[in-house]
């Protein structure tokens, strides 16, 4: 739209329109210049890197991805930028940029330069690496002006006039920078605190009402929210289930560009017992899977590839939602081969994902094990940092009370264990037992067996868990 506007202005030379940008602006520069020939010159910075680096799980800002770029078999960054040929392009790098390492950028440039040469425009692409951190600093802008002078044949001094930075105080949008002093304003932290207080009040009410009314409340607050109807806003879930049924080699596509490889540990014997094992640590998953396989279990390990937390949030989802879908897809594949399917979630993210999957596929699992490092949702409110680390979007706590989530699981057997809190302090066993006392009572009200509660630490669970899953205890 902006480019259309510029081209409509009589005072703009349409033969000399350049596009330059940094970071997310660098991404837009890449895409706009590659796809629209009206851009005569491109100068992207702080976004050039190999596709494998852009699409790993390092937390890069991938909300501006080019469609298909995250597909390992799709077009790479070098192929995308080669579309700018034969127009001039200057690739600017920052030596101190940890998000887009110069090494990856230079490898990308070498491929682009080769492609430019094959297309007869070898002299039209340049690479400069300036000694600065992530950003479009004066050193980089000086290179930009030089490149513009060279190709647009303009005589412009590349030295910028000195600019006096504004004082921090003058940039505040409220007196003293205290936004919360504005009448009626709130922050994400205070909104989550309010949500926590509301949930705590609701729990007190649950203690006072009759078992029948409590069961009805649980049904409406947990099970209904976990129903497919609650997820109609995301049709990709239904598409993913359909796709998973088509894959014969245990390769599940969650959605275009996101591949999940399912590794199988143990012998796939028809009629055996399968365990879908999800952990917050991939290396720990393999260690546990190997140990559980010694109990005669077939362990399925879903491994995520090409992911980004920020992309998930900006797409209206959270990392937890996709992990839940991985468990569900993997369980459906396992059910086609084995007689019984169990699910294990080890760690906070994994345990929540497994519980959600068990609520939505209640007929599929014979046993569900939850080995979590949080005893209840209250501990999430201890710090703002923990909120961000858990990738919770604002309002998440209003829609899902994790303390009540196990109530929606209808599996005949449920195993719950606590390890330690998120801040690595020793687990408060009294608080944990009190928390699960309500859980056990309410499950019995719903005519579901009480869960096994195991307040042990770390690796001590493996022996007991393996015996329980294999049916020995």
Question: Where is each model-derived feature located?
Answer:
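A conserved short beta-strand
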Residues: 38-53, 363-375
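Alpha/beta-hydrolase
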Residues: 45, 278-279, 304, 371
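Gly/Ser-rich "nucleophile elbow"/oxyanion-hole loop immediately N-terminal to the catalytic nucleophile
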Residues: 1-22, 39, 312-348
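Short glycine-enriched nucleophile-adjacent loop
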Residues: 26-37, 350-362, 368
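Short, basic, glycine/proline-bearing loop/turn elements
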Residues: 59-67, 277, 386-391
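Alpha/beta-hydrolase-fold serine-hydrolase catalytic core, especially in secreted/extracellular enzymes
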Residues: 85, 92-261, 265-273, 281-298, ...
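Catalytic-domain carbohydrate-binding cleft regions of carbohydrate-active enzymes
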Residues: 20-22, 29-33, 40, 44-52, ...
């Amino acid at each position: 739209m902006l480019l259309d506007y510029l081209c409509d202005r009589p005072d703009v030379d349409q033969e000399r329109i350049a596009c330059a940008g940094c970071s997310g602006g660098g991404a837009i520069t890449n895409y706009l210049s590659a796809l629209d020939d009206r851009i005569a010159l491109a100068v992207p910075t702080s976004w050039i890197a190999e596709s494998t680096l852009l699409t790993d799980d390092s937390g890069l800002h991938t909300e501006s991805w080019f469609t298909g770029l995250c597909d390992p078999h799709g077009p790479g960054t070098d192929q995308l930028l080669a579309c700018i040929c034969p127009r001039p392009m200057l690739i600017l790098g920052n030596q101190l940029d940890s998000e887009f390492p110069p090494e990856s950028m230079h490898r990308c440039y070498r491929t682009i330069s080769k492609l430019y040469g094959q297309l007869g425009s070898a002299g039209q692409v340049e690479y400069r690496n300036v000694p600065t951190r992530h950003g479009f600093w004066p050193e980089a802008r000086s290179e930009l002006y030089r490149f513009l002078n060279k190709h647009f044949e303009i005589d412009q001094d590349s030295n910028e006039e000195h600019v006096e930075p504004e004082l921090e105080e003058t940039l505040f949008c409220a007196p003293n920078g205290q936004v919360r002093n504005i009448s009626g304003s709130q922050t994400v932290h205070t909104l989550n605190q309010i949500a926590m207080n509301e949930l705590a009040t609701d729990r007190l009410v649950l203690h006072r009402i009759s078992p029948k009314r409590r069961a009805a409340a649980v049904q409406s607050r947990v099970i209904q929210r976990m129903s497919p109807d609650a997820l109609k806003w995301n049709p990709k879930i239904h598409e993913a289930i359909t796709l998973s049924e088509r894959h014969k080699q245990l390769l599940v596509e969650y959605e275009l560009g996101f591949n999940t490889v399912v590794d199988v540990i143990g012998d796939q014997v028809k009629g055996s017992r399968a365990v879908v094992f999800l952990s917050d640590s991939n290396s720990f998953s393999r260690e546990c899977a190997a140990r559980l396989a010694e109990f005669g279990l077939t362990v399925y390990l879903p491994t995520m590839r090409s992911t980004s937390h920020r992309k998930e949030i900006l797409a209206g989802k959270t990392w937890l939602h996709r992990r839940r879908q991985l468990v569900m897809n993997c369980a459906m594949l396992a059910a086609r081969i084995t007689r019984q399917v169990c699910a294990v979630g080890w760690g906070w993210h994994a345990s929540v994902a497994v519980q959600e999957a068990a609520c939505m596929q209640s007929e599929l699992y014979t046993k569900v094990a939850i080995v979590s490092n949080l005893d209840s949702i209250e501990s999430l409110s201890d710090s703002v940092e923990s909120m961000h680390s858990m990738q919770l979007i604002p309002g998440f706590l209003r829609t899902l009370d994790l303390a009540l989530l196990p109530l929606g699981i209808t599996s005949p057997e449920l195993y719950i264990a606590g390890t330690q809190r998120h801040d690595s302090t020793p687990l408060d066993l009294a608080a944990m037992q009190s928390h699960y006392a309500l859980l056990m009572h309410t499950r019995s009200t719903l005519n579901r067996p009480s869960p096994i509660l195991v307040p042990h630490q770390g690796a001590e669970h493996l022996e007991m868990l393996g015996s329980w899953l294999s049916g020995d205890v």
